[in-house]
Regions:
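Acidic (E/D-rich), amphipathic helical modules within compact regulatory domains
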Residues: 48-61, 73, 79-82
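Alpha-helix N-cap/helix-start positions at coil->helix boundaries
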Residues: 18-22, 34, 49-50, 65, ...
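Alpha-solenoid HEAT/ARM repeat scaffold
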Residues: 10, 22-23, 38, 53, ...
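Eukaryotic acidic, Ser/Thr-rich intrinsically disordered low-complexity regions
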Residues: 150-186
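Amphipathic alpha-helical scaffolding segments comprising HEAT/armadillo-like alpha-solenoid repeats
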Residues: 2-14, 33-45, 64-76, 96-115, ...
Length: 186
């Protein structure tokens, strides 16, 4: 199956670190759904950052209440690609619905920290999306977005922060909808 010697979920998780096999392994793990979650969670501790990144991407679709804490912890990973995937998974409601949408008590502090201080502009841009989920209900989130919009060294982060900050188009849409709306611009 899939040209792999072993096809158990643990072996497929390790294949996420192999550029030749990552796509097929990802698709197969995703198709296994809940049956793969345990192996995916274990993969968050793999030495290979590509495996950790792939596991965060999978948890974007497969996260459950038991794995949410581990996904939040991945926002502090030393590899920027892993942090980006973790922030996307935490911010994106489109892929998982509202069943596991994390509340501000679990995710806002790490998102605020990375928005203000992460050295990678792509990580800060993804942190904008997570902070933006709470800009209508938390003054700290709104203030952090305004600060980022005005002062972030990256023009792309400043622009994105403006979309999510009070007065921005995504913020305006969120004011008209529940706080757990999808983060993707329409």
């Amino acid at each position: 199956m899939l040209g792999f010697v072993r096809t158990d979920s643990e072996a497929l998780v390790s294949c996420l670190g192999d550029p030749q096999r990552t796509t097929a392994a990802y698709r197969e793990l995703l198709s296994r759904g809940d049956r793969a979650v345990s192996a995916v969670r274990a993969g968050l501790r793999d030495a290979n950052p590509a495996v950790r990144e792939g596991c965060c991407r999978l948890l974007d679709h497969l996260v459950d209440t038991d794995s949410m804490g581990e996904l939040v912890a991945m926002a502090g990973d030393p590899d920027a690609r892993v942090r980006i995937a973790a922030f996307h998974a935490l911010a994106c409601d489109r892929c998982k619905g509202d069943t596991c949408a994390p509340g501000p008590d679990r995710v806002l502090e790490p998102a605020l920290h990375h928005l203000a201080a992460d050295p990678d502009p792509h990580v800060r841009a993804m942190a904008v999306e997570l902070v933006g989920k709470f800009a209508c209900s938390d003054a700290r989130a709104a203030a952090a977005l305004r600060e980022s919009q005005a002062n972030d060294p990256s023009p792309a982060v400043r622009k994105k922060a403006g979309w999510y900050a009070p007065g921005g188009p995504i913020h305006a849409r969120r004011q008209r909808r529940p706080a757990t709306s999808a983060h993707h611009p329409e």
